[in-house]
A protein has these predicted regions:
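Active-site SXXK
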Residues: 103-117
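N- or domain-start disorder-to-order transition segments that initiate the globular core
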Residues: 58-62, 66-82
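M16 family metallopeptidases and their MPP-like homologs
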Residues: 77, 82-98, 104-106, 122-166, ...
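Non-catalytic, conformational "gating/processing" segments within enzyme and secreted inhibitor domains
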Residues: 174, 181, 231-266
Length: 457
């Protein structure tokens, strides 16, 4: 049996002087599309780790940014250790921006972007990248859709030309749409409908967000996917795929001026689009009652209890709030030395595993949660009570200075390791910029982390 318990709000749960809720963790539902399948990827608590690498020896950022006349925002992150580059195009559009009744259209269009243009024949985009010695991929989230290639430095002009081409010149046939619809429906059956954990997660999200579109699955509801057609896809494409709704990030063995010149040549001729006047979404009302979602399924294996909370994201939090949450959850729920693991797994032996997560990257809000997998002969009710005990201990006692310092030190050590990847740098900057942050916000993050106190947590 899988048992999910969701509390969207704890009215009496106030761990910070400036907070209304204790906000806690994830980096969970991130839709990564390899065009062979819709998969869920967790990127963990190190989502902001790469910010440290953006600081030079004197603390100066290495990132350069500029904007073309047509509105295309460009970031360049030089990294000359190897003659390779990562190119990413981020569109400020995701599943939460879909028209009512058309769930899944953002992800559907992402698939269809690999079909063809007048320049690139149907199905040849990824093959062309591969023939040039590179790799490519794409993903859709509630807030963003992104496409990327990793290639040798001298192949950057080619892949930039290809990205600019499909930004403006996508061609779709009825056959393209019908074929891809079948692929996505099969993905949903395989990844969601046949997986009790995914079913529970989908239902918990729908219960957590009663009005906001974050409660709608990125892949879409089955009955609405079936109704998507060619005109739906082209309408979404024509409305949102534009240079003034996109961010180009290039990381690797390049210099800012050469990228700017190349981008002006490849993207500069694409006209901007009117009508992109912000992202207006329904607001989530205040929640006053807990909601419990329970799933019983013979395929589920051991009993699992999860608890979700609404939380601020880095884009929506008050100054210092999200940083305090990151460190709190490092202490509370990250790894075998966390409070929840030591209490439930080591001391009480009620769980085979336990932890937590903080989803900090949403444009409008974030999520947080705890989970525990029951040990033998432990009921869902006992496990739920045990999780509540850990949460109550945090509410009453907070964290110690030693715990905070250890969490901060481990985080910074992780930053150094994580920042070694140019693709992670490109992904991090692109995602944060596409969800309302600035380069200055990103560069200031390490110092804000250092300023977090025990009282903040």
């Amino acid at each position: 049996m899988l048992r999910g318990r969701l509390r969207a709000r704890f009215p009496d749960f106030n761990l910070r002087p400036y907070g209304k809720i204790m906000w806690i963790l994830d980096q969970l539902v991130y839709a990564l599309d390899m065009r062979a399948g819709f998969v869920l990827a967790s990127f963990g608590l190190a989502s902001l780790a790469v910010a440290v690498a953006a600081e030079g020896a004197q603390g100066a950022p290495r990132v350069s940014e500029f904007t073309l006349k047509n509105g295309l925002h460009i970031l360049v992150i030089p990294d000359h250790r190897a003659p390779v580059v990562t190119q990413m195009v981020w569109y400020k559009i995701g599943a939460a921006d879909e028209p009512p009744g058309s769930s899944g259209i953002a992800h559907f269009l992402e698939h269809l972007m690999f079909k063809g243009t007048d320049l690139i024949p149907n199905g040849e985009f990824s093959k062309t990248v591969a023939r040039n010695g590179g790799e490519d991929n794409a993903f859709t989230n509630h807030d963003v859709t992104a496409y990327f290639q990793r290639v040798a430095k001298d192949r950057l002009p080619k892949v930039m030309e290809m990205e600019a081409d499909r930004m403006a010149n996508l061609r779709l046939s009825e056959e393209d749409v019908a074929t891809e619809r079948k692929v996505i429906l099969e993905e949903r059956r395989t990844r969601v409908d046949n997986d009790p954990g995914s079913i529970l997660q989908e239902q918990m999200m729908a219960a957590l967000y009663t009005n906001h579109p974050y409660g709608i699955p990125i892949i879409g509801w089955d009955h609405e996917i079936r109704a998507l057609d060619r005109e739906d896809a082209l309408s979404f494409y024509r409305r949102f795929y534009a240079p003034n709704n996109a961010i180009l990030v290039v990381a690797g063995d390049v210099e800012p001026e050469e990228v700017k010149t190349l981008a002006e040549d490849k993207f500069g001729k694409i006209p901007p689009k009117d009508g992109l006047n912000g992202r207006i979404r329904p607001e989530e009302p205040a929640h006053s009652t807990p909601v419990k979602v329970t799933l019983e399924d013979a395929r589920a294996g051991r009993t699992t209890v999860q608890r979700y909370y609404l939380a601020p994201s880095y884009a929506s939090a008050e100054p210092g709030e999200a940083e305090a949450v990151d460190l709190l959850m490092r202490v509370a729920a990250a790894g075998s030395i966390s409070k929840i693991y030591k209490k439930l797994v080591v001391e009480d032996q009620k769980a085979a595993n336990a932890g937590g997560w903080y989803s900090d990257s949403g444009l409008d809000s974030g999520r947080l949660g705890f989970y525990a997998i029951a040990a033998k002969n432990v009921s869902a009710e006992d496990l739920e009570e045990a999780i509540d005990g850990v949460v109550e201990d945090l509410r009453q006692n907070g964290v110690t200075q030693e715990e905070l310092d250890r969490a901060r030190a481990s985080y910074i050590a992780e930053f150094v390791y994580t920042s070694d990847s140019q693709s992670r740098m490109a992904r991090h900057y692109g995602w944060r910029l596409a969800t309302g942050m600035t380069v200055a916000d990103i560069e200031a993050w390490p110092d804000r982390l250092r300023r977090v106190t025990v009282d903040d947590v």
